[in-house]
């Protein structure tokens, strides 16, 4: 590791954070913090492009924050950030630059601007031709991809449903399991369907299996002109041509899969939204890039959230974080963040290959509110593990794009108020809790006749002091979504930089792939030689499918 890029645990700030935690932070109480600081909300509120973050309900005081910011400086975070934006090969295990930010920068504001914008212009022109359904004849667009070639577009299209074109339906197929693709095919007309085969290498097993099946269906149903109904987004254009595809939009090896929404992989988003809205998505992301690059660390939202992740993971020992978007359009955001965060930072060695003596990525999971409240919030409030929660709320929503009777508008507006009230109430309840004395003083609901009131009160009490962050979006539009996703990308970069890891490779995906290639023929031959006892037993149980 470069002498200017120090691993976090080797800094003086890390040692001082450990001492501060032992001395006082381990017993930090949010209720006491708010009682002692009438301006805590203002002190820990952060404005960033298109969103506001309330960090005040986190286990964070001024000394801890100062030490975390010192930690960022001692590991050389600003230098690493600037190196990434300039195109340095930060992905050191693959010798590649990390330049997803260049995909959303103005033409002359980042490396590779000319080629990026040439590809973008061509892709958006194609998207507009598809959207002209009177001439294209396309009514259904099916994106076939997996991982970074699926999760970003699959998250973005429903999030921006209000900006999509009526009469043009988007579908996403990722799973190797035919139960995802097969039922969809029964609903499609080959002459009005466009398939997008999204694979960086054009060799991904799941994607190519689904692509071959889609192609066979197209031909079996009398489909003609594969080149007009299949398009590829890939770095391997030759393989796409061999498949029978004439139209392919490329991208570059300095674009990681989970950072590729902004590239040609975003084609299904561009078709759904149109060129103007897709450029707004890029513009929102670029605004967050500039915030990350220029805002002081003390007011830099991605930096603060990344440092908070380190604080909780390495000093408080918390193992996971729950994401609860209070907007149904963001229902796929938790799944998107799972790949972005855990594939990036789920590493056990540093950039030099040295084993890490501390934990890295937390488990990231979640569901939309209020559904989540009726699923796992019981554990968040009363469970034995403390799990920080990230609430995402959208102030203004509209259903004007839908053909609904005007009489529904006040009812839907009231539903939105109730939704926001639920979001705020959950973060308040996690912090405030309810003591046994409070529970005992309340009129209790009907309980077992032989249960003493004090025992019931223990069941009905809440420990409180459970941390949360609330992200407030003015509205869910393309620019706001772009800023939100870019913020999460830079947050991942920040925590990865402190941990001294390469956040841009994913070797953990490869071993299972290799073993699958070895096992696949054995499912037919039954050959179990050289395998472990468990795998032998499972092969025998499966027989020959």
Curated annotation (Swiss-Prot):
<comment type="pathway">
    <text>Carbohydrate degradation; glycolysis; D-glyceraldehyde 3-phosphate and glycerone phosphate from D-glucose: step 2/4.</text>
</comment>
<feature type="active site">
    <location>
        <position position="513"/>
    </location>
</feature>
<dbReference type="InterPro" id="IPR046348">
    <property type="entry name" value="SIS_dom_sf"/>
</dbReference>
<keyword id="KW-0413">Isomerase</keyword>
<dbReference type="GO" id="GO:0004347">
    <property type="term" value="F:glucose-6-phosphate isomerase activity"/>
</dbReference>
<dbReference type="Pfam" id="PF00342">
    <property type="entry name" value="PGI"/>
</dbReference>
<feature type="active site">
    <location>
        <position position="374"/>
    </location>
</feature>
<comment type="similarity">
    <text>Belongs to the GPI family.</text>
</comment>
<dbReference type="InterPro" id="IPR023096">
    <property type="entry name" value="G6P_Isomerase_C"/>
</dbReference>
<protein>
    <recommendedName>
        <fullName>Glucose-6-phosphate isomerase</fullName>
        <ecNumber>5.3.1.9</ecNumber>
    </recommendedName>
</protein>
<dbReference type="GO" id="GO:0005829">
    <property type="term" value="C:cytosol"/>
</dbReference>
<dbReference type="InterPro" id="IPR035476">
    <property type="entry name" value="SIS_PGI_1"/>
</dbReference>
<comment type="pathway">
    <text>Carbohydrate biosynthesis; gluconeogenesis.</text>
</comment>
<keyword id="KW-0312">Gluconeogenesis</keyword>
<dbReference type="InterPro" id="IPR001672">
    <property type="entry name" value="G6P_Isomerase"/>
</dbReference>
<dbReference type="InterPro" id="IPR035482">
    <property type="entry name" value="SIS_PGI_2"/>
</dbReference>
<dbReference type="GO" id="GO:0048029">
    <property type="term" value="F:monosaccharide binding"/>
</dbReference>
<dbReference type="GO" id="GO:0006096">
    <property type="term" value="P:glycolytic process"/>
</dbReference>
<comment type="function">
    <text>Catalyzes the reversible isomerization of glucose-6-phosphate to fructose-6-phosphate.</text>
</comment>
<dbReference type="InterPro" id="IPR018189">
    <property type="entry name" value="Phosphoglucose_isomerase_CS"/>
</dbReference>
<keyword id="KW-0324">Glycolysis</keyword>
<keyword id="KW-0963">Cytoplasm</keyword>
<dbReference type="GO" id="GO:0097367">
    <property type="term" value="F:carbohydrate derivative binding"/>
</dbReference>
<dbReference type="GO" id="GO:0006094">
    <property type="term" value="P:gluconeogenesis"/>
</dbReference>
<feature type="active site" description="Proton donor">
    <location>
        <position position="343"/>
    </location>
</feature>
<dbReference type="GO" id="GO:0051156">
    <property type="term" value="P:glucose 6-phosphate metabolic process"/>
</dbReference>
């Amino acid at each position: 590791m470069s002498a200017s890029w120090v691993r976090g645990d080797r800094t003086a700030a890390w040692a001082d954070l450990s001492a501060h935690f032992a001395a006082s932070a381990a017993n930090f109480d949010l209720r006491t913090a708010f009682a002692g600081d009438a301006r805590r909300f203002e002190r820990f509120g952060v404005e960033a492009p298109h969103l506001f973050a309330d960090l005040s309900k986190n286990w964070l005081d001024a000394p801890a924050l100062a030490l975390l910011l010192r930690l960022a400086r001692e590991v050389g975070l600003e230098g690493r950030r600037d190196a990434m934006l300039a195109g340095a090969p930060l992905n050191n295990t693959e010798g590649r630059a990390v330049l997803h930010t260049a995909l959303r920068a103005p033409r002359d504001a980042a490396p590779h601007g000319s080629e990026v914008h040439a590809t973008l212009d061509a892709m958006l022109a194609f998207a507009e031709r598809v959207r002209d359904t009177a001439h294209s004849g396309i009514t259904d667009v099916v994106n076939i991809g997996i991982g970074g070639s699926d999760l970003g577009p699959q998250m973005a299209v429903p999030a921006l449903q209000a900006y999509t074109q009526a009469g043009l339906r988007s579908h996403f197929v990722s799973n190797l399991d035919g139960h995802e693709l097969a039922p969809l095919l029964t609903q499609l007309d080959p002459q009005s369907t466009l398939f997008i085969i999204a694979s960086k290498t054009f060799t991904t097993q799941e994607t190519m299996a689904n692509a071959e099946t889609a192609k066979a269906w197209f031909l079996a149903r009398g489909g003609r002109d594969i080149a007009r109904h299949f398009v590829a987004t890939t770095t391997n254009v030759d393989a796409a041509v061999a498949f029978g595809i004439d139209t392919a939009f490329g991208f570059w090896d300095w674009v990681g899969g989970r950072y590729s929404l902004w590239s040609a992989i975003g084609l299904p988003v561009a078709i759904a939204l149109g060129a103007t809205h897709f450029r707004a998505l890029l513009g929102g992301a670029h605004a967050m890039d500039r915030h990350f690059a220029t805002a002081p660390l003390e007011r830099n939202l991605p930096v603060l959230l990344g440092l908070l992740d380190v604080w909780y993971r390495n000093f408080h020992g918390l193992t996971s974080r729950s994401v609860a978007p209070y907007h149904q359009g963001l229902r796929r955001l938790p799944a998107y963040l799972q790949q972005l965060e855990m594939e990036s930072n789920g590493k056990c060695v540093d950039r030099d290959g040295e084993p890490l003596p501390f934990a890295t990525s937390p488990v990231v999971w979640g569901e939309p509110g209020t559904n989540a409240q009726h699923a796992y919030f019981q554990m968040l409030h009363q469970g034995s593990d403390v799990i920080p929660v990230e609430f995402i709320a959208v102030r203004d929503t509209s259903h004007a794009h839908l053909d609904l009777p005007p009489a529904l508008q006040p009812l839907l507006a009231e539903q939105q108020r109730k939704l926001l009230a639920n979001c705020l109430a959950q973060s308040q309840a996690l912090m405030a809790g309810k003591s046994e004395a409070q529970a005992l003083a309340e009129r209790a609901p009907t309980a077992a006749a032989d249960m003493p009131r004090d025992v019931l009160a223990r069941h009905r009490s809440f420990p409180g002091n459970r941390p949360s962050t609330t992200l407030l979006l003015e509205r869910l539009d393309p620019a706001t979504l772009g800023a939100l996703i870019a913020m999460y990308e830079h947050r991942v970069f920040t925590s990865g930089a402190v941990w001294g890891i390469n956040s841009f490779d994913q070797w953990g995906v490869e071993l299972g792939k290799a073993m699958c290639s070895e096992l696949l023929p054995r499912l037919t031959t039954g050959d179990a030689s050289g395998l472990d006892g468990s795998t032998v037993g499972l092969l025998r149980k499966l027989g020959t499918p």
